């Protein structure tokens, strides 16, 4: 399905470019790229393709959505970003959070994800329970990413590779530890570690291990472990799709 992007004013475009520069410096300095990427993902990942509700429209700044169990700790991200957002009142929260997610990938060495401005903020947070549950397997991943969001099997595996940065925190998800030995570098090590098997100090969630036992997912894991360029290309495409769920639909 093609996209029909809204036209934004030159002033808006200029504000986006300036905000991007500010975000680059800030996220690098605070070493908070994983948290900011999680904010962008969790904001977008609530989209339901049947009802056309949820999605990347800024609602995650509301306390009601931050209170969802899957969003534990994201109030920190919202708080961290607010002083920068205040410098750009013209920019919607919807655009700002997705822009921050794109920057988080880029400054940790990941691919450049295209960004199109023009999302409008929506007033109503989505209901709880739309985000993936890390304790579940491949059927659940397909229900959430495929049926609800409309993403492909390839998108699911590529997006899982976003766990190359960051760590799980017991007080947020019940799990503890990083997925890779360098959690501030975006590379294909999530997949190489997954294929190597469990290691002391590194995390593999049930939803990660599910990628190895599924006949469609596993070959993609192997492909990405063998070729980082292929992973980067597919990741950029999947991240773009996720960041535009329900936005600019032609």
Curated annotation (Swiss-Prot):
Indicate where this protein is primarily found: cytoplasm
Name its co-factor(s).
heme b
In this chain, K(+) is annotated as bound at 164, 180, 182, 185, 187
* EC number per UniProt: 1.11.1.11
Question: Record's SUPFAM superfamilies?
Answer: Heme-dependent peroxidases (SSF48113)
Q: Where is the composition biased (Basic and acidic residues)?
A: 117-137
The residues that the entry says bind heme b are 163
Query: Which keywords does this Swiss-Prot/TrEMBL entry list?
Result: Calcium, Cytoplasm, Heme, Hydrogen peroxide, Iron, Metal-binding, Oxidoreductase, Peroxidase, Potassium, Stress response
* Compartment(s) of residence: Cytoplasm
Site label Transition state stabilizer, positions: 38
Q: Where is the active site?
A: 42
* A UniProt-annotated Pfam family: peroxidase
Describe what upregulates or represses it. By stress.
Which family does the record claim for this protein?
Answer: Belongs to the peroxidase family. Ascorbate peroxidase subfamily.
What PANTHER family does the record tag this protein with? L-ASCORBATE PEROXIDASE 2, CYTOSOLIC, THYLAKOID LUMENAL 29 KDA PROTEIN, CHLOROPLASTIC-RELATED
Role of this protein: Plays a key role in hydrogen peroxide removal.
- What this protein is called in its record is L-ascorbate peroxidase, cytosolic
Q: Which gene encodes it?
A: APX1
């Amino acid at each position: 399905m093609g996209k029909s992007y809204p036209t934004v004013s030159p002033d808006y475009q200029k504000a986006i470019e300036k905000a991007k520069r500010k975000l680059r410096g800030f996220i690098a300095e605070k070493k908070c790229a994983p948290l900011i990427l999680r904010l962008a993902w969790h904001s977008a990942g609530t989209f339901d393709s049947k009802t056309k509700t949820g999605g990347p429209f800024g609602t995650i700044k509301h306390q009601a959505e931050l209170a969802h169990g899957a969003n534990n700790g994201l109030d920190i991200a919202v708080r961290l970003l607010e002083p920068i957002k205040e410098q750009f009142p013209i920019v919607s929260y919807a655009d700002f959070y997705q822009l921050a997610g794109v920057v988080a990938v880029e400054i940790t060495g990941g691919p450049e994800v295209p960004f199109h401005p023009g999302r409008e903020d929506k007033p109503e947070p989505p209901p709880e329970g739309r985000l993936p549950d890390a304790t579940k397997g491949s059927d659940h991943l397909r229900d959430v990413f495929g049926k609800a969001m409309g993403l492909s099997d390839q998108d699911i595996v590529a997006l899982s590779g976003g766990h190359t940065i960051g760590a799980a925190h017991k007080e947020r998800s019940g799990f503890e530890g990083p997925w890779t030995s360098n959690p501030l570098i975006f590379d294909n090590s999530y997949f190489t570690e997954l294929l190597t098997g469990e290691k002391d100090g590194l995390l593999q969630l049930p939803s990660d291990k599910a990628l190895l036992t599924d006949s469609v997912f596993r070959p993609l894991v192997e492909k990405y472990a063998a070729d980082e360029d292929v992973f980067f290309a597919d990741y950029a495409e999947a991240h773009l799709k996720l960041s535009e769920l329900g936005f600019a639909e032609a």
